[in-house]
Swiss-Prot record:
Protein name, per record: Cellulose synthase-like protein D5
Family, as annotated: Belongs to the glycosyltransferase 2 family. Plant cellulose synthase-like D subfamily.
Tissue spec. comment: Expressed in vascular tissues.
Pfam families attached to this UniProt entry: Cellulose_synt (PF03552), zf-RING_4 (PF14570)
Length: 1181
């Protein structure tokens, strides 16, 4: 259909000329069934492949009888058949001229653009009100409900009503370039009686639709890719002067360097820069015609900088490591050559333990030789990707999309309010709204989580604009309103206090609604179940014709949604097909994808709590996902849930980058995503597989009794690994490159050959190899290679795709799109390299339709991963309870690099278990995963040559550190054995032994001080880490070794309970109440035994020495010193057993004292000291 830009369309009439069958054109719900137009003109671009792979749901699939409690079957096969068999009509529009019986109404008929927007709006409302379910042996169904929780009218929320006071008519479209919204009647009033001036800018109206340049400007807004500068033809009418600098010849067109030639001196407007440079910079180099100033120099600056640790700190640090290594070698040599002949067994055990400790220290210390710091420049990021340029005249965001994954499994242990606050912080993050999508994985399939997310989506319409308007930090409402500081600091808007009070009141009501959901769901389900039971009994009585029924009616105790239909997920009664491990897959788009253009709100009124007239009120897409679970299928815990999210997001939004967060880790710094993208989009960023942020925790007791902050690991070890090949993946707070998760290799890698990998060989991994071994990693093909490569390599690669990724064609088609969108722009990579043109992502996202969601249902089915490589080489890796470490190891093993991003303001914050038992179980799970890694093919011993040597040492230490606990337990008991037996690990305290011991201790202390210096941690944090290393090494780590050996040898499966997340304390409650709760566990037995044995041994040793006529004080001092060293490390454990301060059970001290006295007297009686006297004799009566 051809449309003129200047013609009016008051009454178009569509005339059907010829019907045709099987054309395959797709209906958009408009008057003319034209095929969808794509804004991408490059047919070879992967961005055009997604438009051809989608199918849509016809409007006839949705029932029009208003029966919302019914299921409407919409299988993928039906959708495909319906789409391909749809009729295509050739139509054109006849414009009827105005007549007396047909008056022209200027704005009564909506334009085609408005019709399309209306269709998209209806599609969004349909998607956000429909639950899609499906799975094994069941068709995909769309259950239409109202899940908006009384959400406000989007037209009124978005300000689509007249802005003149007293008028609430709908705005047809803007009549003035200032953007002032006005309805048809008010517009006519302004034209007739208002002098024809706009009420907003007071300028005369000009009909925008009559402007012949409007259509051309709309075409420019599409930001189409331009041809290369070498192929473009310059205007012959212009005389230009071209710079000969090599660095600008491959870049974008620069307006400041191609200007009209003139002889006048008008500042920077001249095309010819004089030789004297106008007196600027003429001192050196001879700035003449060839070196005009670099006006775009800021945009060419790097996004990141690597800052090495000062040489005044790192050089002595490395020297001390070498000195301590020499001292350890001399000490161990002396120990081996000078055995204790009087107690060889004691000498042998101690020497073996010391040798192992030396090896463990060396493996832990070597990866710390090259620590680095990194800085980002957000100003350059904004200028490069969000500023107007030739390919992006409107300055739309050219940043790639990010899909945020939030995982939860049990609403009882992970409170819905905590998850809701995390979701709110994500929705309010400072990142382009249209480029962001949030996915919540509910692995428990609980209705409580579903309805809590619906409530969160409703409250987000108030919270997110409030954060954007007043620049709120942090954007977690619970954390923000709970801050104990002056909230007026740096706030300049006059309405801030009033609006903060309103939002705070609304949030308190939101918390009440969330906390009352469990009881509301229970009461609702009980009422519906009673009603169903009565109906069943009534039906039975009617069938029995009034006779007494002999069989009891059994009605399943279902869980009911608010619209009176069964919840397709987990029921509280745990019925078949509706239990925690047996339920259908569920997808619900709570918030549909936003429009590409900003939508501004309205003034504060009864429905709008805050004034949002100048605030973008769009919200990112929010999706609820619960993968299908069936008996007989291994669901692989969290790793399986994350892989289901990877496939779902690839079909629905396909962001080239993925952020993974736990449900209790919220975004504390709204700029965190931008800082992470600086590394991904900078030069060399195509080799980065993920950007890991440090974990920071809230709710920890001020003394950090159990080293919950873990700063030694996050600020020392991880920062040091950043100087090698990159930090490890720790399970949350990590931005991934999607193609790296798919198991592809980086575009370039370095292999390390020779002794300790000192000889480097750079290789290119872009092209796939025809001959690949079974265990070889997959190389990433160039765009279009799947379908257009004519050689055998491309055919082999295409045949392997279903085996690797599954049988979803939509998912496979999304892979090259994600790879293309994640590329670097040509300014950094160059024309001939694998890059994308600037502005290629500044285009609107394709609308989400129901057929796409139906396809997403199929990829979360329980059988989709069968006979594929998901969990083996693709996605999160299965087979270990610490799937995060294994996943990061696989990426580094392929040659990828990772980055550690430490921001000035913490990027993310979460919670950690402060209870002793919970903390020990958390450490037990980590250590068990390490043992599994040690006995698997993921052991760093079998790493490829693409992994650096020191990086391999770090990964090997991850798998080996739990075995240190066996030697640590023995070494902690040795002082007690020494005191009991009267012997020591050395025959005598020789001066050489003391010198070696002193040198080892001093070098360790100096190393610790230097680590504190370059990492920024405190001495208190370092000491707490040392204490908990002993506590964990004597409790959780040996249990992990035992469990790991049972799994490897006997095949015993290991299962762990989910770590409970504490919710926010109410007013008046003790924030650290859980710290003093004593929960008994078998893990407490070994350290408790060590403590009691050492205390008794000290008493026995003192008694023997005091009563001996020939006391050996040297052995006593050595034994007591080492026993005291053990007890000092176990002091936090003992304090945790005592409970709350001031409430220490007296019986503990009484029995401990009595037991120590009795054991001491019994030892003296059984083994009396030599030379005893009669008055020292003790006899039982």
């Amino acid at each position: 259909m051809v449309k003129s830009a200047a013609s009016q369309s008051p009454s178009p009439v569509t005339i059907t000329v010829t019907p045709c069958k099987g054309s395959g054109d797709r209906s958009l719900g408009l008057t003319s069934p034209i095929p969808r137009a794509s804004v991408i003109t490059n047919q070879n671009s992967p961005l055009s492949s997604r438009a051809t792979r989608r199918t849509s749901i016809s409007s006839g699939n949705r029932r029009s009888n208003g029966d919302e409690g019914r299921y409407c079957s919409m299988s993928v096969e039906d959708l495909t058949a319906e789409t391909t068999n749809s009729e295509c009509v050739l139509s054109y529009t006849v414009h009827i001229p105005p007549t007396p019986d047909h008056q022209t109404v200027f704005a009564s008929q909506e334009s085609e653009e408005d019709e399309m927007l209306k269709g998209n709006s209806n599609q969004k409302s349909f998607l956000s009100g429909t639950i899609f379910t499906g799975g094994f042996k069941s068709v995909t169904r769309g259950h239409v409900i109202d899940c908006s929780m009384d959400r406000a009218d989007p037209e009124k929320k978005s300000g689509q009503i007249c802005w003149l006071k007293g008028c609430d008519e709908k705005v047809v479209h803007g009549r003035c370039e200032c953007g002032f919204r006005i309805c048809r009647d008010c517009y006519f009033d302004c034209i007739t009686s208002g002098g024809g001036n706009c009420p907003g800018c007071k300028e005369p109206y000009r009909d925008i639709n009559d402007d012949p340049e409007t259509e051309e400007e709309d075409e420019e807004d599409e930001a189409k890719p331009l041809p290369q500068m070498g192929e473009s033809k310059l205007d012959k009418r212009l005389s230009v002067v071209k710079s000969f600098k090599a660095q600008n010849q491959a870049g974008d067109f620069d307006h400041t360097r191609w200007l009209f030639e003139t002889k006048g001196t008008y500042g920077y407007g001249n095309a010819v820069w004089p030789k004297d440079g106008y007196g600027i910079g003429s001192g050196g180099g001879g700035n003449g015609y060839e070196t005009p100033p670099e006006f775009g120099e800021r945009s060419k600056r790097p996004l990141t900088r690597k800052v090495s640790v000062s040489a005044a700190i790192i050089s002595p640090y490395r020297l001390l490591i070498a000195l301590r290594l020499v001292a350890l070698g001399l000490f161990l040599t002396w120990r081996v050559r000078h055995p204790n002949r009087e107690a060889m067994w004691l000498w042998g055990m101690s020497t073996t333990c010391e040798l192992w400790f030396a090896l463990s220290w060396l493996l832990d210390q070597l990866p710390k030789l090259c620590p680095v710091n990194r800085l980002t420049d957000l100003g350059v990021l904004k200028e490069r990707f969000e500023s107007p340029n030739l390919r992006n005249p409107k300055g739309r965001s050219d940043l790639p999309g990010i899909d945020v994954f939030v995982s939860t499994a049990d609403p009882e242990k992970e409170p819905p309010l905590v998850t809701a606050n995390t979701i709110l912080s994500i929705l309010a993050v400072d990142y382009p709204v249209e480029k962001l999508a949030c996915y919540l994985s509910d692995d428990g399939g609980a209705l409580l989580t579903f309805e809590a997310l619906a409530q969160t989506a409703s409250f987000a319409s108030t919270w997110v604009p409030f954060c954007r308007k007043h620049n709120i930090e942090p954007r977690n409402p619970e954390a923000y309103f709970g801050q104990k500081r002056n909230f007026l600091k740096n706030k300049v808007r006059l309405d801030f206090v009033r609006e903060r009070r309103r939002v705070k009141r609304e949030y308190d009501e939101f918390k009440v609604r969330i906390n009352s959901l469990p009881e509301a769901i229970r009461r609702r389900s009980d009422a519906y179940n009673v009603h169903e039971e009565l109906r069943a009994k009534k039906k039975q009585m009617e069938m029995m014709m009034g006779n007494n029924p002999q069989e009891t009616v059994i009605v399943p105790k279902a869980t009911w949604m608010s619209d009176g239909s069964h919840w397709p997920g987990t029921w509280s009664s745990g019925e078949t097909d509706n239990s925690r491990g047996d339920h259908a897959g569920i997808i619900q788009a709570m918030l549909a994808p936003p429009n590409a253009e900003p939508v501004y709100g309205a003034e504060a009124d009864a429905e709008n709590l805050i004034d949002t007239t100048d605030v973008d009120i769009r919200l990112p897409m929010l999706v609820y996902v619960s993968r299908e679970k069936r008996p007989g299928y291994d669901h692989n815990k969290k790793a399986g849930a994350m892989n289901a999210l990877v496939r779902t997001s690839a079909i629905m939004s396909n962001g080239p980058f993925i952020l993974n967060l736990d449900c209790d880790h919220y975004i504390y710094n709204s700029m965190a995503l931008r800082e992470g993208m600086c590394f991904m989009l900078d030069r060399g960023g195509d080799r980065i597989c993920y950007v890991q942020f440090p974990q920071r925790f809230e709710g920890i007791d001020p003394n950090d009794r159990y080293a919950n902050h873990n700063t030694v690991f996050f600020d020392v070890s991880m920062r040091a690994l950043d100087g090698l090949q990159g930090p490890m993946y720790v399970g949350t707070g990590c931005i991934f490159r999607r193609t790296a998760l798919y198991g592809f290799s980086p575009p370039r890698a370095t292999e390390h050959h020779g002794w300790l990998g000192r000889r480097k060989v750079k290789i290119s991994l872009r092209r796939p190899k025809a001959m690949m071994k079974k265990d070889d990693e997959v190389s990433l093909p160039i765009n279009g290679e799947y379908n257009e490569e004519e050689n055998d390599d491309g055919d082999i690669e295409s045949l392997l795709l279903p085996k690797r990724f599954g049988n979803s064609n939509s998912f496979v088609a999304s892979i090259p799109v994600a790879e293309y969108q994640g590329r670097l722009i040509q300014d950094l990579q160059g024309k001939g390299k694998n890059s994308r043109p600037a502005g290629s992502l500044a285009v609107p996202r394709e609308p989400l339709d129901a057929a796409t969601v139906a396809e997403a249902i199929s990829v979360i089915s329980c059988f989709y991963e069968d006979k594929t490589e998901w969990g083996k080489r693709v996605g999160w890796i299965y087979g270990s309870v610490t799937e995060d470490v294994v996943t990061g190891y696989r990426m580094h093993n392929r040659g990828w690099r990772s980055i550690y991003c430490v921001t000035k303001r913490d990027a993310f914050r979460g919670t950690a278990p402060i209870n002793l038992t919970d903390r020990l179980h958390q450490v037990l799970r980590w250590a068990t995963g390490s043992v599994e890694i040690f006995f698997s093919r993921n052991n760093a011993i079998f790493a490829t040559r693409r992994m650096k040597f020191l990086q391999r040492v770090a990964y090997f230490n991850v798998g080996m550190y739990p075995f240190t606990s066996l030697f640590l337990i023995v070494y902690c008991i040795l002082p007690a054995i020494s005191l009991f037996s009267g012997q020591f690990i050395v025959q005598s305290l020789d001066i050489t032994f003391l010198i070696y011991l002193l040198s080892i201790t001093l070098t360790l202390c100096m190393l610790s001080l230097l680590e504190i210096k370059w990492s920024g941690i405190t001495l208190h944090e370092w000491w707490r880490n040392e204490q908990f290393w002993v506590i964990g090494g004597t409790s959780a780590h040996p249990a992990a070794v035992l469990q790991g050996l049972l799994k490897v040898i006997a095949g015993v499966d290991i299962s762990f309970t989910l770590t409970s997340k504490s919710s926010a304390p109410e007013d008046g409650d003790d924030e650290f109440a859980d710290l003093y709760v004593v929960k008994w566990s078998f893990l407490m037995v070994p350290p408790l035994t060590i403590m009691m044995v050492n205390m008794i041994a000290i008493a026995v040793g003192l008694a023997r020495t005091l009563y001996s006529p020939f006391p050996q004080w040297s052995k006593l001092v050595g034994g007591v010193f080492f026993s005291f060293w053990v007890l000092c490390h176990l002091y936090p454990f003992a304090k945790g057993l005592m409970g709350r301060r001031g409430r220490v059970p007296t019986i503990v001290f009484v029995w401990s004292g009595l037991l120590s006295i009795i054991v001491s007297l019994l030892w003296v009686y059984i083994n009396p000291p030599s030379g005893k006297q009669d008055y020292m004799q003790f006899q039982f009566p």
